Amino acid sequence: MDLKKYIRDIENFPKTGIMFKDISPLLANGKALNYTITEMAKLAQDVDVIVGPDARGFLFGTPTAAFLKKPFIMVRKPGKLPGDVISKSYDLEYGNNVLQIQKGFIKKGQTVAIIDDVLATGGTTKAIIKLLEEQGAIVKKVILLLELVDLNGRQLITKDNDIEIVSLVKF
């Protein structure tokens, strides 16, 4: 299935000069959504845990984990997860950000696939990898709906490791 048919361009969103890749048509089409989850599940069969960032990583990671009967671990911004959390700060172009996971859900030695909607610059994904590795997880794969190739996120992620990155669609 050609998933590009279900991803539309929205000019100047969320700000002027940005060409936003809108996945709403894919989510609104049951066959395209099912195909996407099925393909992601094929790619994630060989890991112990699925991890996804808020919010759109939840859209693809949770149903993939459920399909495979594997756990799904949320990565969120501060103040969004109850209980004890582990935090990782990372730099953005203009400032920094923090990501968190709940303590105790990742076990040392578990293999992980990170599932998200888009790979752009790779900064968020790189921070998630570091957060997981600091907990003893082995990040094997990053599975994405789409990759914005010109933003070089793949190069940022793979320059320090040999994590497999798989994108269902590349722009």
UniProtKB/Swiss-Prot annotation:
Gene Ontology MF: a single term: adenine phosphoribosyltransferase activity
Main localization of the protein described in the UniProt heading: cytoplasm
Cell compartment(s), UniProt: Cytoplasm
E.C. designation(s): 2.4.2.7
GO biological process: adenine salvage; AMP salvage; purine ribonucleoside salvage
Keywords from the UniProt entry: Cytoplasm, Glycosyltransferase, Purine salvage, Transferase
Matching Pfam families: Pribosyltran
SUPFAM superfamilies assigned to the protein according to its UniProt record, in alphabetical order: PRTase-like
Annotated pathway: Purine metabolism; AMP biosynthesis via salvage pathway; AMP from adenine: step 1/1
Catalytic activity: AMP + diphosphate = 5-phospho-alpha-D-ribose 1-diphosphate + adenine
GO cellular component: cytoplasm
First-level EC class: transferase
NCBIfam families on file: apt (TIGR01090), PRK02304.1-5 (NF002636)
Quaternary structure note: Homodimer.
Function: Catalyzes a salvage reaction resulting in the formation of AMP, that is energically less costly than de novo synthesis.
Record-stated family: Belongs to the purine/pyrimidine phosphoribosyltransferase family.
The protein, known as: Adenine phosphoribosyltransferase
Organism encoding this protein: Mycoplasmopsis fermentans (strain ATCC 19989 / NBRC 14854 / NCTC 10117 / PG18) (Mycoplasma fermentans)
